[in-house]
Amino acid sequence: MGLEAFLPVALVIGYLLGSIPFGLVLTRLAGTQDIRSIGSGSIGATNVLRTGRKSLAAGTLLLDALKGTVAVVIAGYIAGPNAAMAAGLGAFLGHLFPVWLKFKGGKGVAVYIGILLGLFWPAAVVFCLLWLATAFTTRYSSLSALVASFITPMFLWWFGHLALSALFAVLTLLLFYAHRENIKRLQSGKESRIGEKA
């Protein structure tokens, strides 16, 4: 199999890894309520935090990020950078639209960071710093993710990573789509702040 022929395989492998709903798995194992029935209904770390279980939220954040990192590292090792990017796209799509949960997944922030970490780690550091700065000043997790993801493709473009910039422009659009209800709540002043329970 040629390297280009491996791209669809990388996309599928990434999707399958990304579709593992760690937030739902961890909260069920811990005996908490169905994470999809509280807060935003998302299976991601921010919504897990609304259960009041910080350890579960941290575990979800770590495992969701690792989905993206593992996908791109494995695909990149096997078939090079294009396969790594395909796997990253697949992992992101898998997290947002997991087939196991009727295509209703998370918002993609942790996976976004994990993909960045695997493809160009300085951009992951910049993303996290932007997220932290915005979160510190506003206490809105959603706004922090939107700001950081909006700037990330420009950061990659500035440093000459044009293919990565294009990939993350697509991921940013998907992330904004996943946060469409958050954006409406931010505009109306009804968005929950970090640490607030549902």
Swiss-Prot record:
The chain crosses the membrane at residues 6-26, 56-78, 83-101, 113-133, 155-175. It is found in: Cell inner membrane. Keywords: Cell inner membrane, Cell membrane, Lipid biosynthesis, Lipid metabolism, Membrane, Phospholipid biosynthesis, Phospholipid metabolism, Transferase, Transmembrane, Transmembrane helix. It is a multi-pass membrane protein. The keyword Transferase applies. GO terms for biological process: phospholipid biosynthetic process. Its EC number is 2.3.1.275. It holds the Pfam family G3P_acyltransf. Pathway: Lipid metabolism; phospholipid metabolism. It catalyses: an acyl phosphate + sn-glycerol 3-phosphate = a 1-acyl-sn-glycero-3-phosphate + phosphate. GO terms for cellular component: plasma membrane. The keyword Membrane applies. Probably interacts with PlsX. Belongs to the PlsY family. PANTHER family: GLYCEROL-3-PHOSPHATE ACYLTRANSFERASE-RELATED (PTHR30309:SF0), INNER MEMBRANE PROTEIN YGIH (PTHR30309). This is Glycerol-3-phosphate acyltransferase. It comes from Bradyrhizobium diazoefficiens (strain JCM 10833 / BCRC 13528 / IAM 13628 / NBRC 14792 / USDA 110).
